[in-house]
């Protein structure tokens, strides 16, 4: 799994989480201008033609040649799509140079991109793609079926140990039928395949470049996309220049040729607090906003603020099921009632979030608010005390919670460092449990060390945040043995397996509802909230569009100044 779990479990954790709105966010605004028109007028009984100045309303025409400057939350270790699951790296790869066979439209349906069409076998275990002809990688080599096979085979190769492997499900082989036909064969139907392939897992890079650069390819990536890498100054910036031979085949991008902007500059700005200044000085064009600074930009005529509430993330507590008492569903239920979700929304996220009861993000297919309400556990500390008592935990006269052996209860809750609002959520959890007489020690570490530590047993609970636009995220987290090899087998396993092999969208959504109920009935986690995605755009940025997976579509972007 990953620093950001993947493209389908997609983008996890970090501050720069992309919005998932699918409509253009910043279209050119009509403005009043004075022009000279030739008009026909009547003068003393005769018709004459003359020129006069008139005031009209017009929309500025898009112009090219701009340099677009955006923020990078961190300097990627590599831009090799096969070897990374970093959110930051995935965003750079997907947005600027590496395209896929399919993309998802604003309604959440797969559409052809580098593929022209596809056919699915009757038993749904073979998918055959017809590829577009005449497409070139930016190094001048051909995109074809052999290139598709080369890229996917790298992910399938156990020796490569690609973190993308889990997103190919039961895929057994990729076969070249002819130069522009490629066939994927599965052991069993795999419902998340198309959405996984629309993300970085499905990136098709130049085999020639990958072979030429070998282990250094991640610093010299080549795709069929609208931009090509120019310069990479480690720790400072990455610069891309326009691919002048580019062809755009997506129908959600107006410009079908080379992108309007000449260059893309990605500035490495890791500090959350620096984003405000970078926006105010015009150093960057767009900035994703932490909850603390949203109010600063709302109402400022120099910016447009976009707030997306239909998000695909959930912040939740996970248990170390290998340790008592977290192997006891009664204790997990008690903890769930002990958490004041609204306090976390208000105190940790300044109100820019929504309470969550379901383990599935509210923006995902299959999410049902009725299920979340019926099976959710609203804040009720008295009920939490009663459940703890049923599990053998009691409060003594001093209000200290004692375990069944009569010892004071003390737990360690861990998470990752560097994300202010996650840390504040931890503090709410700590305070809620302290109110019940439970001592909680908080511990954070940088992402890599934190995630690695979860394979061990030196923790009791951890606060996690996942993002994904597909319900298969539930499989990745909860299907035993779980993403950190701690999850026990349970009735949810068979349901999750069925959801992953159910290809009909309606039937799959019903299956996903069953999975949510099973996970909630077994108290497999404590969902707390889903935070909104918020960003500010300089008011002169035009046609800034985010797609279904949260990726920028740079081809139409231009600066109206």
Regions found by a protein language model. Give the residues of each.
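Ligand-site clamp/hinge motif
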Residues: 218, 248-297, 427-431, 437-441, ...
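Extracellular/periplasmic solute-recognition and catalytic clefts
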Residues: 155, 159, 173-175, 230-241, ...
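Detector for C-terminal structural segments
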Residues: 92-95, 233-238, 338-371, 421-431, ...
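Structural transition elements
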Residues: 227, 320, 355-397, 417-424
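N-terminal lobe/hinge region of extracytoplasmic solute-binding protein
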Residues: 71-122, 153, 222
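Aromatic- and charge-enriched surface segment that lines or borders ligand/interaction sites
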Residues: 116-161, 177, 183, 325-327
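Gly/Pro-rich hinge or "lid" segments in bacterial periplasmic/extracellular proteins
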Residues: 105-109, 198-265, 271-273, 380-386, ...
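Surface-exposed binding/hinge segments that line
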Residues: 130, 165-209, 226-233
């Amino acid at each position: 799994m990953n620093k950001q779990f993947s493209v389908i479990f997609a983008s996890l954790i970090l501050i720069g989480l992309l919005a998932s709105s699918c409509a253009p966010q910043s279209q050119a605004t009509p403005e009043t201008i004075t022009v000279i028109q030739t008009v026909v007028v009547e003068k003393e009984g005769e018709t004459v033609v003359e020129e006069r100045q008139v005031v009209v309303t017009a929309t500025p025409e898009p112009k090219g040649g701009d340099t677009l400057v955006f923020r990078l939350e961190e300097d990627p270790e590599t831009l090799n799509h096969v070897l990374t699951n970093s959110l930051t790296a995935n965003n750079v790869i997907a947005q600027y140079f590496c395209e896929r066979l399919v993309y998802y439209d604003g309604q959440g349906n797969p559409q052809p991109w580098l593929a022209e069409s596809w056919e699915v076998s009757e038993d749904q275990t073979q998918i055959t793609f017809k590829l577009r002809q005449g497409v070139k990688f930016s190094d001048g080599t051909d995109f074809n079926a052999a290139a598709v096979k080369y890229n996917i085979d790298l992910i399938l190769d156990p020796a490569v140990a690609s973190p993308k492997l889990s997103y190919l499900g039961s895929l057994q082989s990729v076969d070249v039928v002819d130069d522009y036909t490629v066939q994927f064969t599965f052991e069993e139907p795999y419902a998340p395949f198309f959405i996984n392939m629309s993300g970085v897992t499905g990136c098709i890079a130049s085999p020639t470049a990958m072979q030429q650069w070998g282990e250094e390819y991640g610093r010299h990536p080549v795709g069929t996309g609208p931009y090509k890498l120019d310069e990479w100054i480690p720790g400072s910036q990455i610069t891309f220049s326009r691919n002048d031979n580019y062809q755009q085949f997506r129908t959600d991008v107006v410009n079908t040729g080379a992108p309007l902007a000449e260059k893309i500059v990605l500035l490495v700005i890791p500090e959350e607090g620096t984003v405000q200044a970078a926006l105010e000085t015009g150093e960057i064009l767009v900035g994703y906003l932490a909850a603390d600074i949203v109010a600063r930009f709302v109402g400022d005529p120099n910016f447009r603020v976009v707030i997306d509430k239909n998000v695909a993330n959930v912040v939740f507590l996970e248990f170390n099921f290998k340790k008592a008492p977290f192997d006891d569903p009664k204790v997990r239920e008690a903890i769930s009632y002990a958490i004041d979700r609204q306090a976390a929304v208000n105190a940790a996220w300044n109100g820019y979030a929504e309470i969550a009861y379901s383990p599935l993000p509210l923006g995902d297919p299959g999410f049902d608010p009725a299920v979340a309400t019926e099976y959710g556990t609203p804040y009720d500390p008295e009920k939490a005390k009663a459940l703890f008592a049923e599990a053998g935990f009691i409060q003594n006269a001093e209000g200290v919670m004692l375990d069944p052996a009569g010892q004071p209860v003390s737990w360690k809750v861990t998470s990752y460092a560097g994300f202010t609002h996650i840390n504040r959520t931890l503090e709410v959890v700590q305070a809620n449990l302290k109110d019940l007489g439970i001592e909680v020690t908080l511990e954070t570490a940088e992402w890599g060390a934190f995630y690695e530590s979860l394979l061990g047993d030196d923790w009791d609970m951890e606060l996690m945040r996942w993002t994904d636009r597909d319900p298969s995220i539930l499989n990745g987290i909860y299907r035993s043995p779980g993403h950190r090899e701690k999850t026990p087998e349970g009735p949810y396993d068979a349901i999750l397996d069925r959801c992953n092999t159910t290809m009909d969208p309606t039937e799959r959504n019903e299956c996903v509802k069953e999975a949510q109920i099973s996970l909630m009935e077994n108290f497999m986690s404590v969902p707390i909230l889903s935070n909104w995605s918020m960003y500010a755009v300089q008011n002169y940025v035009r046609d800034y569009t985010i797609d279904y997976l949260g990726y920028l579509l740079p081809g139409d972007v231009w600066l109206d100044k």
